[in-house]
Amino acid sequence: AQESRGLGDVYKRQKELGVYTVTINASNIDGTTTKDVSVEVVETMPYVVKFPTPSYLQTSTDRYTFADRPVFLRPLLEYFDNPRFEWSVDGQVMEGEVERMFKFTPSAPGEYTVSCTVSEDTPTEKISRNIDKGKTAVTATVKVVCVDKKEQDGFRASGSSKLWNKVYEYTPAPGQFINETSTIGGMTGNETSPEAAVAWATQRLKDKLHVSLGSFGGYIIVGFDHSIPNSGNQYDFCVQGNAFDGSSEPGIVWVMQDINGNGLPDDEWYELKGSEAGKEETIQNFEVTYYRPEGKKMDVQWISSDGRNGWVDYLSAYHTQDYYYPAWISENSYTLTGTCLAARNTQDSQTGYWDNQSYDWGYVDNFGNDQIEGGSTVDGSGQRNGFKISNAIHADGTEANLQYIDFIKIQCGVLAKSGWLGEVSTEVFSFEDLTK
């Protein structure tokens, strides 16, 4: 073992299979705490290959599309170090398709079974007398449904309101306004189920009060009583935030068509590209896993898919709720995936004030050049950003060419914190169709 600052003892490798108990002792001037942790040494890592669902609370991995419109399939992986990929459609291996993301374009209506076999491309390694690390392979399948209709067949005629009419899901990341029952946060303390969280968010938006999305990856999904058409080069809809000069907390915009016609946001999400799309520092498919704190008024720990780790600070000077981890998330950890922008927050060394700088265009709650006139630029009240459906892109960055949309998802697009201001967290107030 070796001593490492902030970590204690670091143990390298056990040579025998089995479950080992590691005892951790932590002490300071206030006393000593002891905790036992079980570590299992296994012969083969529990490799996982699975396809994602359209949102955290949904369970089906089925994908929907129209004939000649591609879907981009990318499995989630656990424990792989050097994965190799093999794709097949209805049992036929797709020669040359060896990347993690597979572009599948059905030419005719029907159901297709797409399989991805992932192997650990590592020569057999003798770890110890009883433990070998060798090649393993895991297969996951996903059903792709090519619906028997044209895109225009799903367009829903203009409804009675130009405003959003329903919140379908509210899954924020941990943050200082989550579970907050003061007049600032506005929660009641009874938001202990996804349904209750949606009801709360619905009422907040009706009152045009802010709904916080927490740290990176937190999101809200809303819909309208009609489809919003692609008007060409004009702004098709807008989202109200509270950005002002020096206070931008950008939210990524995703849109969806109700391809399967069931009235639910369980189809394909398309990102609306903004000014940062395609830049080297912008990371697609970025994952952050948040962990439930073991006690009250504690920071929320996280790890990210690029190997970083950190925490969402608990700000005891400003908020009194026990936990920043959403009370309606039953699991002890959850992972949020999306597009992550490079942070633009800086602190003035003289005054100590933080500046959350803006991005050019394409993001919610952002003091960019796509703002709709009418909002205050002093405190952000009524601040709105305009968005074009023509900016919808596929996962590979190519244009999606959508004729209309039915659902909108806003997702916090930055993993950062600004000292005493707390985490960078997108806030939304309202959604409006600008084509009516």
Stretches found by the model and what they are:
Residues 1-11:
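Single conserved hydrophobic/aromatic residue that forms the stacking wall/gate
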Residues 4, 92-98:
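Short beta-strand segments within Ig-like beta-sandwich modules, predominantly Fibronectin type-III
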Residues 9-19, 99-111:
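Solvent-exposed segments in extracellular or luminal domains encompassing
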Residues 33-43, 125-149:
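C-terminal edge beta-strand
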Residues 64-77:
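A short beta-strand segment in extracellular, disulfide-stabilized domains
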Residues 79-86:
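Solvent-exposed loop segments of extracellular immunoglobulin-like
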Residues 145-236, 240-249, 273-436:
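A domain-level signal for the mature, folded cores of soluble proteins
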